[in-house]
């Protein structure tokens, strides 16, 4: 399946608008383990992996990482919904079908990386409830190892609060080298 990685001006404007809303309403507090990574990652495709605690995670983490142009993997059932699916498709996303052995997500992810984009993957494959992480699916490690990409771990801590209350904390760790 051929995939168009070049977004039009309307889509880019929408992504910037969403980023502005996220920073205005949710006010994520981002902490880098190594501040120098902010510059060294620019223009370099990597695989960002993050825990998944809420439906907002994809939008919030993508907004925080927008300068690194991440494509996020999205469960196909969400991608296909009429309301949220349209929103998800406008943002940089690639559908993953958990119900079949479909590997289109991998081919599309390879294409995104080849075109200079990073990947944002929630390796749990779903939202973890009760503060306990789910077992990881192998996709993030597979893509990183096969393409020789660094893995950048991210921890999303706390609950989302709109406007008031404690800010969502996003911790971005040091790169993990991958080899195949």
Residue spans of the language-model regions?
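Short, Lys/Arg-rich, polar N-terminal cytosolic tail immediately upstream
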Residues: 1-5
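Soluble catalytic domains of membrane acyltransferases
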Residues: 7, 11-15, 28-180
């Amino acid at each position: 399946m051929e995939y168009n990685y070049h977004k039009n001006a309307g889509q880019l404007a929408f992504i910037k608008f969403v980023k502005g809303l996220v920073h205005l309403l949710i006010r994520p507090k981002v902490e880098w383990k190594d501040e120098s990574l902010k510059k060294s990652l620019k223009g370099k495709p990597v695989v960002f992996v993050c825990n998944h605690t809420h439906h907002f995670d994809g939008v919030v983490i993508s907004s925080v990482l927008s300068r690194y142009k991440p494509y996020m993997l999205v469960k196909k059932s969400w991608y296909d919904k009429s309301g949220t699916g349209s929103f998800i498709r406008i943002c940089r996303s690639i559908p993953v079908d958990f119900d079949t052995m479909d590997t289109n997500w991998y081919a599309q992810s390879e294409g995104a990386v080849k075109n200079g984009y990073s990947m944002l993957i929630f390796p749990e494959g779903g939202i973890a409830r009760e503060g306990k992480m789910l077992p990881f699916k192998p996709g993030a490690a597979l893509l990183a190892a096969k393409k020789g990409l660094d893995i950048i771990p991210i921890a999303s801590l706390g609950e989302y609060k709109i406007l008031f209350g404690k800010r969502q904390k996003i911790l971005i760790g040091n790169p993990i080298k991958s080899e195949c």
